[in-house]
C-alpha cells in the first residue's frame, strides 16, 4: 500500500509489478497494489518515484496475514500467530498492527448474569458481547460490562479498538513522553532519533476479571 501508486515503478524480486490499484488502505490517498507471493528467505521490493524539491515520500506498507518479528532495528516476516495472549501484542508478532482485535473466551453462566472487568488495556475502547449479541462498551472507570444471559455455555467476545500509532506513528522518535504529534515528530534527529523501533504498548494487558 502506498501513495501516488500511479507514479511508482515497482519491482519485486526482479520482476516488474503492474501498479494497478485494488482499493484503499485506511485512507483514500493510500492505494493497494497486489504483489506476487513472498518467498522464504530474502525478498527485494524496489519502488522508484520521480523525486524533486517539491516532492514528498510517505511510508509504504506490506499488507497480508502474517506476523512480524522485530529485533532492534531489524524486522522480518513470520507466520501469523495462532493465538494471542493477554498482554502486549507488540511482543506477540504484531508490532505494527493497527486494526481491531477480538478475544474469544468460553464462559459458563450460572446466575443469568455476567460481569466482566477489563481495567488495564492500551487502545481506544473495548466492547463486550455474548454470543455476538449487542455489545456493551468498556471505556470509563470502573471498566466493567454487565450482561444478562441464560445459564449455560457461551462465548464472550472482547473487542479491542486499537489505534494507528504503531502503523502510522513516529516509531523512531525517542521521546516517548511527547504527547503532541505534528510534522516534526517524523523528522526527529540527533539524540531524538532511533534506528531501533519505538513502539507503544497495545492490547488488553491484564487478564479480565469475569464473574458469572
Model-predicted regions and their roles:
Residues 2-4, 22-28, 33-106, 118-120, ...:
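An acidic-aromatic loop/edge-strand motif
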Residues 21-25, 134-139:
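Short beta-strand segments within Ig-like beta-sandwich modules, predominantly Fibronectin type-III
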Amino acid at each position: 500500500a502506498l501513495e501516488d501508486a500511479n507514479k511508482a515503478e515497482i519491482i519485486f524480486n526482479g520482476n516488474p509489478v503492474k501498479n494497478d490499484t485494488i482499493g484503499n488502505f485506511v485512507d483514500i490517498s493510500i492505494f493497494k497494489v497486489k504483489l506476487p507471493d513472498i518467498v522464504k528467505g530474502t525478498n527485494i521490493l524496489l519502488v522508484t518515484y520521480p523525486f524533486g524539491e517539491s516532492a514528498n515520500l510517505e511510508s509504504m506498507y506490506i499488507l497480508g496475514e502474517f506476523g512480524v518479528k522485530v529485533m532492534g532495528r531489524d524486522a522480518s516476516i513470520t507466520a501469523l500467530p495462532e493465538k494471542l495472549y493477554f498482554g502486549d501484542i507488540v511482543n506477540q508478532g504484531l508490532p505494527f498492527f493497527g486494526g481491531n482485535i477480538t478475544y474469544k473466551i468460553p464462559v459458563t453462566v450460572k446466575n443469568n448474569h455476567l460481569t466482566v472487568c477489563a481495567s488495564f488495556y492500551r487502545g481506544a475502547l473495548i466492547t463486550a458481547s455474548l454470543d455476538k449479541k449487542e455489545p456493551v462498551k468498556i471505556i470509563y472507570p470502573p471498566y466493567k460490562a454487565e450482561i444478562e444471559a441464560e445459564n449455560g455455555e457461551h462465548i464472550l467476545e472482547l473487542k479491542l479498538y486499537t489505534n494507528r500509532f504503531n502503523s502510522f506513528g513516529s516509531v523512531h522518535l525517542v521521546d516517548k513522553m511527547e504527547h503532541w504529534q505534528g510534522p516534526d515528530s517524523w523528522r526527529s534527529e540527533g539524540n531524538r532519533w532511533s534506528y531501533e523501533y519505538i513502539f507503544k504498548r497495545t492490547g488488553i494487558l491484564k487478564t479480565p476479571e469475569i464473574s458469572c
